[in-house]
Amino acid sequence: MTVEVGADENPDFAHDETDGAGDESDDEDAQGRDPELDLAVQYGDEIGDAQRKSLPKRKVIAEWLEPAIFSDAQFTVRFVGADEGRALNHSYRHKDYATNVLTFAYGEEPDGVTVADLVLCCPVVEKEAREQGKTLVAHYAHLLVHGALHAQGYDHERGEEDAAEMEALEIDILAKLGFPNPYR
């Protein structure tokens, strides 16, 4: 949903410690370099220390987001509980329930940097993963990629053609990251 305006302790969120130096990329920008991601991670008041340990860490989040950005980006990822998720969805979308991910896209800066906040509601993400028979790690990866695409102007709610384009991108990006098709 788009609104305009340390070390891993959980093996499901394990990652390769390499920095990817020397890797070829299909996502190089016009200057012949990979897009850069400036990433901050925040936790809402409802997210306690125990839950933080089970969430994907900053490095893993960056690894998931990097193939989903097509120009330099500055993202804040915020993990929230049901109360904050519901309040944000109500305030900005006039819907009185918490949703899985909200993207607050602030547009592109004059220097071409895409700026956005991605807000993930942990209880909703966890419930959906269980109900859909997905691993939690795969569902978080999917929703982060989904939110990043929204931040760059993709919108599945504009029509079937736009939805198909966005889903195809998500499937391709997630496959490159080693995740299954989230729509099966």
From Swiss-Prot:
Region of interest: Disordered: 1-38
UniProt entry tagged with the keyword Phosphoprotein: no
UniProt enzyme class: hydrolase
GO biological process, alphabetically ordered: rRNA processing
Record-linked Gene3D superfamilies: Metalloproteases ('zincins'), catalytic domain
GO cellular component, one term: cytoplasm
Binding site for Zn(2+): 146, 150, 156
GO molecular function annotations of the record: metalloendopeptidase activity; RNA endonuclease activity; zinc ion binding
Its job: Single strand-specific metallo-endoribonuclease involved in late-stage 70S ribosome quality control and in maturation of the 3' terminus of the 16S rRNA.
HAMAP family noted in UniProt: Endoribonucl_YbeY
Designated name of the protein: Endoribonuclease YbeY
Protein source organism: Burkholderia pseudomallei (strain K96243)
